[in-house]
């Protein structure tokens, strides 16, 4: 293995609390807007966090977007109910807040803008004038918190039914089903809900037809096999040509972020597996790393390599399903059955190590659940001998097929500018020629010590390029796994830290305070320091991140989960307008998404 650490991770510990006043962007902002225009918040997010006035928000955003090395991507946007937060020393007074997370690819740096709001004046201007992908994020922010977005093109519910009442992520909104009245579906309510699902083109600025002909409006989903889940797209058609479309999401929404406010730091780990249910341990990684930043925990090299190994196994598992179902969407059936044979080998290996298959919930705050079992290396070696030859056969028999290439090359194509505008990450972004893989540019869990390449496209991201990049990513994951096999360090599988590891039994028998603390941490969960932390990872479908806010409790005050698929589905209309319905099926297969990752 080789060292490839970038300069992004400063020499400070990953969990240090910093205000990032030395970041060049802070100086640029102060030179433009004055030294006292902002409040800079010290956090453990690893990025500058700047509170701006609502009246300056768009001006500051436009300034950042036009810098010599601009902040070109709106990575995330959401809100927080600050009313019950007790640890706010030095922060602007706020009942609610909205944050805007921007990324500069050229700088390889981020900045987070925050706006403080009072309860009797909940409004911010729409950010869609600067970043079109703010649309869905702002709809969700309004829906979950009741924060009005002034100038938004279509401010309506996105996750919840149109008939829903209330704003679920407010602190005064119930978090458990038992806090609601029993649900009853009367005939009148059923009729009301069905009427709410009726699509009205005028609500979306669509015409029902031209002077000479009417458009057809067609529902694709929410139960269509090519929709890859409970996902509905309303198509405006002129013959078979897609004039426009409206993606309709939320059918799989489970309230994952609300659950984070009612689970202990430890007991929330199983929920992370269900965010993107194919990713397994990959989903656990950003959460446990973010909590470890809050706690100030550093894990052993062995833990880092074990985590990387499990993550890459699940990456291969997810990519195999993606590639085979893409081929199936184009029209070839056989490869998907071969792929499930290969995925079974991965599940056998994962089960031997963790005891579970799809949702191991195996990573722990400060380590992993238990050490590697005897014989793990033999199972991994057998898989590494098997998989490369199978991958070659997929490529030769199906992916180089003339018909498949003809159906996917040039379909749903977009360039780097559009990818950045819509918050596209993962293979969809790299296919445009932008070399941005978090494992390389912002290494975590020891990825800087592995020798692997990042596949990058030639400038245009189309369906075929995206799937071929995933094939090469599979090969790179196999390289990483080989290095895990050859270089597994010795050492503990759990950090010796009071917030994660029980004390020695003999000490609990002699010191009552130690026993009391142990009892409280096991029964109620550990208390994390009051701070904010953030961690992004290169997940199976793009960049996944957790932004955690602790108020010095056994539970998270706010758990924000940013998933790649949410951004990718918002991009669908811009990429598919003018194409045929058959092209849409190929495009959906090339995105690589599951609806749990979209809806959370």
Swiss-Prot record:
Locations listed in the record: Cell inner membrane
Enzyme class: translocase
Main location as per UniProt: membrane
SUPFAM superfamilies cross-referenced by the UniProt entry: HydB/Nqo4-like, Nqo5-like
Family classification: In the N-terminal section; belongs to the complex I 30 kDa subunit family.
Free-text function comment from the UniProt entry: NDH-1 shuttles electrons from NADH, via FMN and iron-sulfur (Fe-S) centers, to quinones in the respiratory chain. The immediate electron acceptor for the enzyme in this species is believed to be ubiquinone. Couples the redox reaction to proton translocation (for every two electrons transferred, four hydrogen ions are translocated across the cytoplasmic membrane), and thus conserves the redox energy in a proton gradient.
Record's subunit section: NDH-1 is composed of 13 different subunits. Subunits NuoB, CD, E, F, and G constitute the peripheral sector of the complex.
Protein name: NADH-quinone oxidoreductase subunit C/D
Originating organism: Salmonella paratyphi C (strain RKS4594)
Record gene name: nuoC
